[in-house]
Design a protein with these regions (language model features):
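Internal hydrophobic alpha-helix adjacent to the cofactor/substrate pocket in enzyme cavities
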Residues: 347-368
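C-terminal auxiliary extensions adjacent to catalytic cores
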Residues: 394-435
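N-terminal FAD cofactor-binding segment of flavoenzymes
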Residues: 17-78, 372-383
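Predominantly flavin-linked oxidoreductase catalytic cores and closely associated redox partners
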Residues: 106-284, 288-289
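Beta1/beta-strand and adjacent pyrophosphate-binding region of the FAD-binding site
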Residues: 1-11
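A glycine-rich dinucleotide-binding beta-alpha-beta segment and adjacent secondary-structure elements
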Residues: 275-341, 348-350, 368-385, 391-395, ...
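N-terminal Rossmann-like dinucleotide/flavin-binding domain of flavoprotein oxidoreductases
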Residues: 65-69, 73-113
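A short alpha-helix-loop-beta-strand transition element characteristic
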Residues: 59-63, 67, 75-88, 148-157, ...
Length: 435
C-alpha cells in the first residue's frame, strides 16, 4: 500500500506522518529546493510564512481546543511546535526555523516515507493526497482545473508581516509585557499617543502599495488583512484591532496609551521580532518610512519586509466530502488551506484527518466518527456543507460547533464547557484513532 502526498507544508507533512505511523508507505513529493513559491524562503518542510504564532493556547478559544485535540491524538506538528516553543503569553509561538527544521528531520528519517524532490505537474495514479497549498504551482493548478472544472477554484489575497531586529528597538520608548499581564512578559509594546497615532495613520493610508499581479478585485481574507487596508476603514479602526491598547499599561505613565504596536518574538534567541497584525503589501521603502514613525521603531532594522501573495482554494462544499475526499474520485483527497480551512493549525488538522482516514480505508477499517462537537470534525463538516452559498476560508470557531444543551453564564465559561465536551469525545475515540 502506497500513498502519494503532494506538498510538504503543514498539512502534507502531518498527513504523511499519520499515514507512515500506521504502516502505510508514503511518497512525499515536494518541489523545493528545485522551485519555490514567492512566500517561501527556506528549503525546509512546514515553513511558516505569515507568522510564527499558532495563536491562542487557551481552551476558552476554539483554536486552543483544536490544538489540544491534535496533541492528544499524536499530531507531528503539535509535537514539533511544543519542542521549539518560544514564550508568547497565552499563545503558542515557535522558533519558525527550528520548527521547520525539526519537522523536516522527522519526516526525512521516517522509514515509511520517501521524499521525492521536484515539481509535480500531474495527478499520479493510485491513492493521492493533494496538499500543495494556496500557492500551488501554475502547472499543477492548470491540471487541477482540468480535473475539477474551470469554476472549481476561488481565491483571495494573503499577506505577511515585517520582521525587525530586537536590538534596533528603542526600549526607552517601549516595554516588555503581555496583555492584562497574562503569562510572562513576552511582547515588546510600542506605545503611541493620539498625535503620533494620527500622523502614523495618515501616512499609512496614503502610502504607495506594491503592484500585485492580478490584484484587481482586491479580495483579502479578514484574518490576514493588510494593515493599510484595515486602516482605510476608519481613523480608529486599528485601535480596535491590532493596535488596541486594552489591558496594556505603560509603566512610564501608569496609563493605557492611545494605541500600542506589539512585537512578538520570532525566534528562540529573541533576536528577531515580528510586528503583530502588520501584514502588508506596501512598497518596501514605504514600509521603512511609515513603520519607522512608530516611536520605538524610529531606528528599526527591518530584517524582512512584508509581502503579499495570491491564495487559491477549492469550492470545497461542491467537490469534497467530510473526509476531504474528492466526491467524483475518492482515491484523491485534498488537505490544507486549499480546502478552505484557514490557518496553520487548521491546515495541520485537515492533514491529520486525511492521513488517519486514508490509512484506515486502505486497511479495511471504517472511518472514525469525529462529530461536529469536536473541532477536528467541525472543520471537515464545514468545508463539505453544501448549504453554504458563498464559501469562504474559515478559521476554527465555536460557531461551527453545536451549542450546549443548557445555559451557561459568561462566554469564557461557555467556551470552556464546549471544550470539555469535545475533549471527552476525543478521549473516547483516541484508542480507535491511534490504531
Amino acid at each position: 500500500m502506497n500513498v502519494t502526498v503532494i506538498g510538504a507544508g503543514l498539512a502534507g507533512s502531518e498527513c504523511a506522518w499519520q499515514l507512515a505511523q500506521r504502516g502505510i508507505k508514503v511518497t512525499l513529493r515536494e518541489m523545493k529546493p528545485e522551485k519555490r513559491t514567492p512566500a517561501h524562503t527556506t528549503d525546509h518542510f512546514a515553513e511558516l510564512c505569515c507568522s510564527n504564532s499558532l495563536r491562542s493556547d487557551q481552551l476558552e478559544n476554539a483554536v486552543g481546543l483544536l490544538k489540544e485535540e491534535l496533541r492528544r491524538l499524536g499530531s507531528l506538528i503539535l509535537q514539533c511546535a511544543g519542542e521549539t516553543r518560544v514564550e508568547a503569553g497565552g499563545a503558542l509561538a515557535v522558533d519558525r526555523h527550528g520548527f521547520a527544521a525539526l519537522v523536516t528531520e522527522r519526516i526525512r528519517t521516517h522509514p515509511n516515507i520517501t521524499v521525492v524532490e521536484g515539481e509535480v505537474t500531474d495527478i499520479p495514479e493510485g491513492e493521492v493526497v493533494v496538499a500543495s497549498g494556496p500557492l500551488t504551482s501554475n502547472a499543477l493548478a492548470d491540471r487541477l482545473r482540468t480535473l475539477l472544472g474551470a469554476d472549481s477554484a476561488l481565491h483571495f489575497y494573503d499577506a505577511a508581516a515585517p520582521l525587525v531586529s530586537a536590538g534596533s528597538v528603542d526600549l526607552d520608548l517601549a516595554w516588555f509585557g503581555s496583555r492584562y499581564d497574562k503569562g510572562t512578559a513576552d511582547y515588546i509594546n510600542c506605545p503611541m499617543n493620539e498625535e503620533e497615532y494620527t500622523a502614523f495613520w495618515q501616512a499609512l493610508t496614503t502610502a504607495q502599495e506594491a503592484e500585485v499581479h492580478g490584484f484587481e478585485d482586491q479580495k483579502v481574507f479578514e484574518g490576514c488583512m493588510p494593515v493599510e487596508v484595515m486602516a482605510r476603514r476608519g481613523r480608529d479602526t486599528l485601535c480596535y484591532g491590532p493596535l488596541k491598547p486594552r489591558g496594556l499599561r505603560d509603566p512610564r505613565t501608569g496609563k493605557e496609551p492611545y494605541a500600542v504596536v506589539q512585537l512578538r518574538r520570532d525566534n528562540a534567541d529573541g533576536t528577531v521580532y515580528n510586528l503583530v497584525g502588520f501584514q502588508t503589501h506596501l512598497r518596501f521603502p514605504e514600509q521603512k518610512r511609515v513603520f519607522s514613525m512608530i516611536p520605538a521603531l524610529h531606528s528599526a532594522e527591518f530584517l524582512r519586509y512584508g509581502v503579499m501573495h495570491r491564495n487559491t482554494f477549492l469550492d470545497a462544499p461542491r467537490l469534497l466530502d467530510r473526509y476531504y475526499r474528492l466526491k467524483s474520485q475518492p482515491r484523491i483527497s485534498f488537505a490544507g488551506q486549499m480546502t478552505g480551512v484557514e490557518g496553520y493549525v487548521e491546515s495541520a488538522a485537515s492533514g491529520f484527518l486525511v492521513g488517519v482516514e486514508t490509512a484506515r480505508r486502505l486497511r479495511g477499517l471504517p472511518p472514525v466518527d469525529f462529530p461536529r462537537e469536536t473541532a477536528v470534525g467541525a472543520l471537515g463538516l464545514y468545508i463539505s456543507n453544501q448549504s453554504v452559498t458563498a464559501f469562504q476560508p474559515m478559521n476554527i470557531n465555536f460557531g461551527i460547533m453545536p451549542p450546549l444543551d443548557h445555559r451557561v453564564k459568561g462566554k469564557r465559561n461557555k467556551n470552556a464547557e464546549l471544550s470539555a465536551r469535545s475533549l471527552e469525545i476525543i478521549e473516547s475515540v483516541k484508542e480507535e484513532v491511534m490504531a
